[in-house]
């Protein structure tokens, strides 16, 4: 016997979270809980403003329609990426497809003061990998910060994310301030330039490896082995169903590329599922999931070791 619940939620964000020139004051989303007999599965649907094609309201309408169809015996999935991902996660939990084992390691995210990152990395066991957002300030400043970090911590490898912020000139200004001896310890730089061709040229000219992120969601993108391209960053909330995520990981691995499962600032419930997906599909690769500290609360399932309060399902607004 099938049954389902849908919850709507809103989590206050820390001050200072900016996405594509928009301040994100709250993280808004939905949960679906599917039941079939004794089994239960949860999924999170939280379109990311400025990045997702669909709005929260559109996702809610699509989710409620899909849930009602599922209750009637339908086996299909919704079209919208965030809804397809959340629904497929709920089904994967319900059927036991999604393993419980999780990779709760996360590459620490530095959005501001590099000194904070140095302190966090000092306590990090094993491989030291961190992520730094670049492109928010002057390219020269970004280059200097990256150089300081690589100089201060000799065993550090950095993942950088520019979100296509730079012109070729700005990208070259950044590279100019990174010591050529340190560039090999930049694991990759996500989408440095506004176009793929400019990003490819940057990689060739500087020796700094790049990764595709936004490109994966463009209609003309194909997986290819290319000089200077080392990785793909997969954000499941923006990608679609779990099957589509698995296809992209497999395509990347077939070409010898690193595939990194990455957060779209999901709640703790969604992040714990991403940690399980990472352990399952990309074992041995550190996922990019260090976004919980941007929020003021957790929900339903806590992230191990987090001191943030965790809300229970009874405290959420139920829609169905």
UniProtKB/Swiss-Prot annotation:
CDD domains per UniProt: OSBS (cd03320)
Record key words, sorted: Lyase, Magnesium, Menaquinone biosynthesis, Metal-binding
Pathway: Quinol/quinone metabolism; 1,4-dihydroxy-2-naphthoate biosynthesis; 1,4-dihydroxy-2-naphthoate from chorismate: step 4/7; Quinol/quinone metabolism; menaquinone biosynthesis
SUPFAM superfamilies tied to this protein: Enolase C-terminal domain-like, Enolase N-terminal domain-like
Cofactor (UniProt): a divalent metal cation
MF annotations from Gene Ontology: magnesium ion binding; O-succinylbenzoate synthase activity
EC number per UniProt: 4.2.1.113
Reaction equations catalysed: (1R,6R)-6-hydroxy-2-succinyl-cyclohexa-2,4-diene-1-carboxylate = 2-succinylbenzoate + H2O
Any single GO BP term: menaquinone biosynthetic process
Active-site annotation: 133, 235
Binding site for Mg(2+): 161, 190, 213
Coiled-coil annotated spans: none
Keyword Transferase in annotation: no
Top class in the EC scheme: lyase
SMART domains: MR_MLE
Family that this chain belongs to: Belongs to the mandelate racemase/muconate lactonizing enzyme family. MenC type 1 subfamily.
Chain's role: Converts 2-succinyl-6-hydroxy-2,4-cyclohexadiene-1-carboxylate (SHCHC) to 2-succinylbenzoate (OSB).
Protein known as: o-succinylbenzoate synthase
Native species: Salmonella heidelberg (strain SL476)
């Amino acid at each position: 016997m099938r049954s389902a619940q849908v919850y709507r939620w809103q989590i206050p964000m820390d001050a200072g979270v900016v996405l594509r020139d928009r301040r994100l004051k709250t993280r808004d989303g939905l949960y679906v809980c599917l039941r079939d007999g004794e089994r239960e599965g949860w999924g999170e649907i939280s379109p990311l403003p400025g990045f997702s094609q669909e709005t929260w309201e559109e996702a809610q309408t699509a989710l409620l329609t899909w849930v009602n169809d599922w209750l009637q015996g339908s086996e299909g999935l919704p079209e919208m990426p965030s809804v397809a991902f959340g629904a497929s996660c709920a089904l994967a939990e319900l059927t036991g497809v999604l393993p419980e084992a999780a990779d709760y390691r996360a590459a620490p995210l530095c959005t501001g003061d590099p000194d904070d990152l140095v302190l966090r990395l000092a306590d990090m066991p094993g491989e030291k990998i961190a992520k730094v957002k670049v492109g928010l300030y002057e390219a020269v400043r970004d280059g200097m910060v990256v150089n300081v970090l690589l100089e201060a911590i000799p065993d550090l490898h950095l993942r950088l994310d520019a979100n296509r912020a730079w012109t070729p000139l700005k990208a070259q200004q950044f590279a100019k301030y990174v010591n050529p001896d340190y560039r090999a310890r930049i694991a990759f730089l996500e989408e440095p330039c506004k176009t793929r061709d400019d990003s490819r040229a940057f990689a060739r000219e500087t020796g700094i490896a790049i990764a595709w992120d936004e490109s994966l969601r463009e209609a003309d993108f194909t997986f290819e082995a290319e000089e200077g391209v080392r990785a793909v960053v997969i954000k499941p909330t923006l990608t679609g169903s779990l099957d589509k995520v698995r296809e992209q990981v497999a395509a990347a691995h077939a070409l010898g590329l690193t595939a990194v499962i990455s957060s779209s600032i999901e709640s703790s419930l969604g992040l714990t599922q991403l940690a399980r997906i990472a352990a399952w599909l990309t074992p041995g690769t550190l996922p990019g999931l260090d976004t919980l500290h941007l929020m003021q609360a957790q929900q339903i399932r806590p992230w191990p070791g987090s001191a943030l309060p965790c809300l229970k399902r009874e405290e959420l607004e139920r829609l169905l």
